[in-house]
């Protein structure tokens, strides 16, 4: 209920603000219609539209005329924008017209000055006419015959018939025609002179172009010769560098060859010398051993022969031959034949073994000698091959050196010839360049003289052409400005017609505004009726509060009498609800207060810490539990008599009532907190809106006391 009333209040306040802003807009429009002013109305209307858009109805009941008001305001805004555009266009056209008028006045002044200049020039022409006619009569006649025969015919006809015009007007026209003819003659003469000079200049320019082309070709040739000289110098430097490199390489190769020869000789001396000496020593040692072995063998053979002879001569004189023939058969004979035979055989065996070893050593020495000889031969062949290769390399290097020397000499000769040719070409080029420079200087002098004469003639032509061009330009500018004036007048007529249409539209919009204001007045009347109803409801609430206070005082008095009486049915119901609701804190708090527990009992139960806050019994208008218990204990018989017929008893109903009342009170407190927050937010928005629209604020509809009353 309270939220709907607040929404109605906010909507009515917005409607009132819109109505006041519409009144301000109408005043501004009337001012605009009276004095053709746009800035004030635009500013007011823009603020009005901002306020409307700011106060968009979102919370409660929308007024039926709100959309129509917005639509009308949008149309009014469009009309005002079109009016502002029309006014800006009119201002721009007025500025353009002023500029055009200023330009026309300037052109008139320039025309007057040109007329004065023409009069002065005509006087000067009259004075110089006699001189010009004497000096250049024949040339002017020729030019007129070639270029403008019609003009000559006209001038002659005018000169031959002076007597036809007898009045003053005829004389004036004759003088004007003569001046025109003279001006035409001067123009023809200047044009013919300019054409002749132009042809001469063209010829001279062609000659200059030819000379310049020849100069450019000679410069290109000289540059090409210079490039060739530079290339020849570079080639010479390259060849000299190559020759120096080849000489350095030859010196390095000769040094390497010398080092190789030295190394070869040293290696031969180092490798062959000790090998040969070692072989010689080994050979000598082997020869000595061989001689010693031969001597021992000969001695042993002699001793053997002597011993054989002795044995054969004593025991077996016929066996000497068999021993000499078959010495190996001695082993087969019995050892008992000769007592020193075994020792002799052993010594012979030893000697044979020594001989075999010496033979083996001799063979080994011979093999080593053969191997060393072969090795020496191989080394000699390798060294000879190396020497042959070195000699070949030396010969090849000598041949290359000779070939390079011949090339160097040939290149030096060609360089000398090229240098001499270059010097000759340079001298010839220098002579040609000098001649060309002289010719160029002469041509430049001629060019400067011709250009000076051309410039002087061009200045004269330009002066005459500028005078004529200014005259024709002024005439064309006048015609152009007249056309623009006509166009501007047509556009002004169109803009005035548009302004009339916009005024008619404004009148229709004003009528629609009046209809909207009548609807707003009706809405204000409805709001006043709602205010009266709200005041009546507030009075009824005040009466109900007074009755409640009286009943509360009575209940307090009754509770003092029945303070220690509680109905057992209430106690039973409290216990049952406590266990049913899983030891609810609120039910326990209610039991503690209704039964009047002491501090020790509370500590035993554990309700001392849980006390405080929003209890169930406080939900019933804020009275203690003992008071409620006293009431029920004092009137237990009456309650028992008036109990319902169904299963629920009065105690059950009473406890349910207390719990429901507590829940309702908590919910009410939450709603009140939310309403207070919303109220604070709305008040902030209103304050911001009031600060923002302080320029266009109106007198408030109701006082602050009524607003406070409605918020309560």
Curated annotation (Swiss-Prot):
GO cellular component terms, A-Z: endosome; Golgi apparatus
Subcellular location: Golgi apparatus; Endosome
Region (Disordered) residue spans: 23-49, 135-176, 306-347, 666-712
UniProt entry keywords in alphabetical sequence: Coiled coil, Endosome, Golgi apparatus
GO biological process, one term: Golgi organization
Basic and acidic residues: compositionally biased ranges: 328-344, 678-695
Main location: Golgi
Feature: compositional bias, Polar residues: 36-49, 135-150, 696-712
Domain GRIP: from-to ranges: 557-608
Coiled coil: 65-134, 197-313, 340-558, 659-690
Function: Golgi matrix protein playing a role in tethering of vesicles to Golgi membranes and in maintaining the overall structure of the Golgi apparatus.
PANTHER family, per database record: MYOSIN HEAVY CHAIN - RELATED (PTHR18921), THYROID RECEPTOR-INTERACTING PROTEIN 11 (PTHR18921:SF2)
Written domain comment of the UniProt record: The C-terminal domain (551-712) is responsible for the Golgi localization.
Subunit structure, as described in the record: Interacts with ARF1; preferentially with the active form of the protein.
The protein, known as: Golgin candidate 3
Natural source organism: Arabidopsis thaliana (Mouse-ear cress)
Lineage of the species this protein comes from: Eukaryota, Viridiplantae, Streptophyta, Embryophyta, Tracheophyta
Gene name for this UniProt entry: GC3
């Amino acid at each position: 209920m309270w939220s709907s009333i607040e929404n109605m209040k906010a909507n009515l306040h917005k409607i009132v603000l819109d109505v006041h802003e519409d009144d301000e807009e109408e005043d501004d429009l009337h001012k605009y219609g009276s004095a053709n002013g746009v800035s004030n109305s635009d500013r007011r209307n823009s603020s009005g539209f901002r306020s409307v858009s700011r106060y968009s109805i979102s919370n409660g009941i929308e007024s039926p005329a709100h959309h129509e008001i917005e639509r009308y305001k949008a149309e009014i805004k469009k009309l005002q924008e079109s009016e502002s555009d029309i006014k800006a266009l009119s201002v721009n056209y007025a500025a353009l017209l002023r500029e055009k008028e200023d330009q026309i006045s300037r052109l008139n002044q320039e025309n007057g000055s040109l007329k004065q200049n023409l009069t002065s020039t005509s006087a000067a022409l009259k004075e110089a006419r006699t001189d010009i006619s004497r000096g250049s009569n024949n040339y002017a006649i020729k030019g007129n015959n070639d270029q403008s025969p019609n003009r000559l015919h006209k001038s002659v006809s005018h000169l031959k018939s002076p007597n036809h015009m007898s009045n003053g007007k005829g004389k004036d026209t004759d003088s004007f025609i003569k001046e025109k003819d003279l001006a035409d003659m001067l123009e023809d003469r200047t044009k013919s002179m300019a054409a002749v000079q132009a042809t001469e200049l063209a010829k001279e320019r062609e000659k200059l172009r030819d000379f310049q082309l020849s100069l450019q070709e000679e410069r290109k040739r000289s540059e090409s010769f210079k490039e060739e000289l530079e290339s020849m110098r570079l080639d010479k430097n390259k060849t000299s560098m190559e020759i120096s490199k080849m000489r350095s390489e030859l010196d390095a190769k000769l040094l390497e060859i010398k080092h190789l020869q030295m190394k070869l000789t040293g290696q031969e001396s180092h490798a062959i010398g000790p090998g040969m000496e070692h072989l010689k020593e080994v050979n000598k040692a082997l020869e000595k051993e061989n001689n010693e072995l031969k001597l021992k063998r000969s001695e042993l053979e002699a001793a053997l022969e002597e011993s054989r002879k002795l044995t054969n001569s004593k025991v077996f004189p016929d066996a000497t031959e068999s021993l000499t023939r078959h010495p190996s058969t001695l082993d087969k004979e019995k050892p008992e034949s000769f007592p020193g035979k075994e020792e002799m055989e052993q010594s012979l065996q030893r000697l044979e073994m020594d001989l075999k070893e010496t033979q083996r050593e001799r063979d080994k020495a011979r093999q080593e000698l053969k191997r060393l000889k072969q090795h020496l031969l191989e080394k000699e062949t390798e060294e000879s091959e190396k020497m042959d290769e070195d000699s070949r390399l030396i010969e090849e290097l000598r041949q290359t050196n000779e070939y390079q020397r011949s090339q160097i000499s040939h290149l030096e000769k060609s360089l000398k010839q090229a240098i001499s040719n270059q010097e000759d070409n340079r001298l010839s080029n220098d002579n040609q360049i000098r001649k060309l420079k002289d010719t160029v200087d002469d041509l430049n002098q001629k060019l400067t003289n011709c250009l000076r004469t051309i410039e002087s003639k061009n200045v004269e032509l330009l002066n005459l052409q500028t005078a004529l061009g200014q005259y024709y330009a002024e005439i064309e500018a006048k015609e152009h400005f007249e056309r623009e004036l006509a166009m501007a007048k047509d556009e002004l007529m169109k803009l005035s017609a548009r302004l009339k249409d916009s005024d008619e539209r404004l009148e229709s919009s004003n009528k629609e505004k009046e209809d909207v204001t009548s609807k707003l007045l009706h809405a204000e009347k409805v709001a006043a009726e709602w205010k009266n109803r709200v005041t009546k409801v507030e009075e009824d609430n005040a009466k109900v509060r007074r009755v409640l206070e009286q009943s509360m005082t009575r209940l307090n008095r009754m509770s003092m009498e029945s303070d220690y009486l509680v109905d057992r049915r209430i106690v039973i119901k409290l216990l049952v609800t406590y266990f049913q609701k899983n030891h609810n804190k609120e039910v326990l708090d209610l039991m503690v207060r209704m039964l009047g527990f002491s501090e020790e009992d509370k500590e035993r139960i554990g309700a001392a810490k849980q006390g405080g806050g929003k209890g169930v019994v406080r939900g019933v208008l804020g009275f203690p539990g003992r008071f409620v218990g006293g009431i029920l204990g004092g009137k237990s018989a009456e309650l028992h008599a008036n109990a319902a017929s169904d299963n629920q008893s009065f105690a059950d109903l009473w406890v349910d009532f207390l719990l429901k009342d507590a829940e309702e009170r908590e919910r009410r407190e939450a709603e009140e907190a939310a309403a207070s927050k919303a109220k604070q937010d709305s008040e902030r928005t209103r304050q911001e809106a009031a600060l923002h629209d302080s320029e266009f604020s109106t007198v408030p509809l109701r006082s602050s006391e009524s607003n406070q009353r409605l918020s309560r």
